[in-house]
Amino acid sequence: MTEYLLILVSTILVNNFVLVQFLGLCPFMGVSNKLETAMGMSLATTFVLTLSSLCSYLAYEYLLAPLGMEFLKTITFILVIAVVVQFTEMVIKKTSPLLYRVLGIFLPLITTNCAVLGVALLNIKKQNDFMESILYGFGAAVGFSLVLTLFSAMRERIAAADVPEPFKGGAIGMITAGLMSLAFLGFTGLVNI
């Protein structure tokens, strides 16, 4: 049980995929202008990351490894992620058409989010078992959601602030992301996995 808690703390805070490992920066910068959009993207990414982590583990352990075709893991994981994203897109379209319209192009772009593929590949590299793979994916998703939500809230406040002309737009966003990354580096050494 303690090991599972350490995996969650490690993926959420210590080894955050966006601010420490620099994976998933495209949706981080692209969807963070409004808090509502960021929350929707966070929920969709959490669902996709957790489910694709599970499906990728199963595909590797019960299809690729027994057949000696481990070299196909990247292509297989991309296909698995694409299927999970399509499933998520259909669910969101049926349950929340407004959220579906707000997310727009960013929902299909979860397929190419390097954090999703990175989690699947790191699960295999770390030789995580079934439960550890699910928790690793869920923790990475919660960490992504936490950072995206905090960053979008800060960007909304910055948009209302008096920012010097050269720093408006993407420049102040990058500075803010850098400061957040430095803050998360303070968690280094908290958990050693």
UniProtKB/Swiss-Prot annotation:
One of its GO terms (cellular component) is plasma membrane. The chain crosses the membrane at residues 5-25, 38-58, 65-85, 102-122, 134-154, 171-191. Keywords: Cell inner membrane, Cell membrane, Electron transport, Membrane, Translocase, Transmembrane, Transmembrane helix, Transport. Coiled coil: none annotated. It is found in: Cell inner membrane. It is a multi-pass membrane protein. Its main location: membrane. Its EC number is 7.-.-.-. GO terms for biological process: electron transport chain. It holds the Pfam family Rnf-Nqr. HAMAP family: RsxA_RnfA. Part of a membrane-bound complex that couples electron transfer with translocation of ions across the membrane. Belongs to the NqrDE/RnfAE family. NCBIfam families: PRK05151.1 (NF003481), rnfA (TIGR01943). The complex is composed of six subunits: RnfA, RnfB, RnfC, RnfD, RnfE and RnfG. PANTHER family: INTEGRAL MEMBRANE PROTEIN OF SOXR-REDUCING COMPLEX (PTHR30335), ION-TRANSLOCATING OXIDOREDUCTASE COMPLEX SUBUNIT A (PTHR30335:SF0). This is Ion-translocating oxidoreductase complex subunit A. It comes from Hahella chejuensis (strain KCTC 2396). The lineage of its organism: Bacteria, Pseudomonadati, Pseudomonadota, Gammaproteobacteria, Oceanospirillales. The gene is rnfA.
